[in-house]
A protein has these predicted regions:
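Acidic catalytic/metal-coordinating carboxylates
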Residues: 34-37, 60-63
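Alpha4 helix (beta4-alpha4-beta5 surface) of REC/receiver domains from two-component response regulators
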Residues: 15, 63, 84-99, 112
Length: 119
């Protein structure tokens, strides 16, 4: 099953994502609390997929996405964000996001998106 890095500044969101992903059989190999830490963990771990929140301190999700995709164009990144951030989602896709999911989401919806991205 795919290895996944969760990048989100909310401890609650990370816990929920981890629970859903592990219950679906994915291996959560790491977590990060901001975009810079997410980039650093990506370089260290090279997971199959990154789930990336958009609004975070230090380096937001869009900037972290640009940084990861700039150096690792084949990286698979799924943006996870609050509903109502359509402009940010368009910006994320324009900068290489493979997919996105809006909170709140169902576990089956997330699984379908991860499976699609992993191929």
């Amino acid at each position: 099953m795919a290895s996944i890095l969760i990048v989100d500044d909310s401890r609650t969101s990370r816990k929920i994502l981890k629970g859903i992903l592990e219950s679906e059989g994915y291996e959560v190999v790491g977590e990060a609390t901001n975009g810079q830490e997410g980039y650093d963990r990506y370089v260290e771990l090279k997971p199959d997929v990154v789930t990336m929140d958009i609004t975070m301190p230090v380096l937001d999700g869009i900037e972290a996405l640009k940084k990861i995709k700039g150096e690792y164009p084949d990286a698979k990144v799924v943006m996870v964000t609050a509903a109502g951030q359509k402009t940010k989602m368009v910006e994320a896709v324009q900068n290489g996001a493979n997919e996105f999911v809006s909170k709140p989401f169902e576990s089956e919806q997330l699984k379908k998106i991860i499976d699609k991205v992993v191929g």
